[in-house]
Amino acid sequence: MGKYVLKKIASLALTLLAVSFVVFLLFSVIPGDPAVSKLGTQATPEKVEALREELGLNGPFIVRYFKWVGGLFRGNLGQSYAYSMPVSKLIGSKLLINATLSILAILIVAGVSIPIGVYTAKHTGGFMDKVFTVINQIFMAFPPFLLGLILTFFFGMVLKLFSPGAYVGYEKNFLGFLGYMICPAIALALPKTAMCIKLLRTNILEEAKKDYAKTSYSKGNNTTGLLYKYVLKNAIMPTITFVGMIFADMIASGIVIEQTFGIPGLGRSLLSAISVRDYPVVEAIVMLIAFGIVFVSALTDIIHAAVDPRVR
């Protein structure tokens, strides 16, 4: 198991290195000059050139790349062109916001989909199975931003459980912050939860049809014991993998959710940085997102290998 974990860590590092090269290359060749964006189009060529030199934009590509990557390894994400402050300080507080949103959403997906998926598989064809099937179809058809608007209207304006747009910062009131983040997390999680319920139910029913399950049942093992001891262990593996895969989609959807609920997270900072060509901020956020996706993917594989040694 140790060798497998080390192999995954090495793979993670190589993937991030490749992503860093592509990201840096992309923002080096796209049209637009950060110096002009900061000084304005009326600035003289001399001032533009002086600022480019100050920002280190005139050096060879490969030198600038290795300098940037070296900074990443030291935790130095660079200096913001627009705000003239360290990128780590600019986006550090927003990272906790997005991490909280993603973790809450993943917990909702896992906490709801597993028990309901098991229940509907165990009572397949029953009344509640049909009810959950209809509900799943409805939620899978709803985009997260639309769910966000509906939840904002219902919980914020009808039930008045929170004030829409009145975001509470974690540094002021952490419990208030968590309370405000629950609704966005639900909006982000519900479509994925519906998918996970359907996937887990299907996998359990498929596993129950296999010879080992039929043999165990014929020997007198009751349905519940067979389900939890053998079938669920094998059926849940694809669901764990799927949860890891949807993490990337959650990050993309989270940017929209931020706008819907007025959350000052990484998504808003990313859009703002792109509009003013603040490339160090954009590159840092993209790398953080890439790290999150690759890390969760590697963690999912490690959990899969721990549960099922055949994967190693």
Where are these regions (language model features)?
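An internal, D/E-rich "acidic patch" concept
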Residues: 58-114
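N-terminal signal-anchor/signal peptide hydrophobic helix marking the start
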Residues: 6-16
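Membrane-interfacial helix-loop-helix junctions in multi-pass membrane proteins
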Residues: 53-62, 74-87, 168-181, 188, ...
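Membrane-water interface segments at the C-terminal ends of transmembrane alpha-helices
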Residues: 23-29, 59, 67-70, 134-164, ...
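Hydrophobic alpha-helical transmembrane segments of membrane transport/permease proteins
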Residues: 16-66, 159-180
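Membrane-embedded alpha-helical segments of multi-pass transporters/permeases
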Residues: 16, 20, 24-29, 145, ...
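Alpha-helical transmembrane segments of integral membrane proteins
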Residues: 2-3, 95-128, 144, 173-312
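Low-complexity, intrinsically disordered, cysteine-poor segments enriched in small/polar
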Residues: 61-64, 68, 72, 90, ...
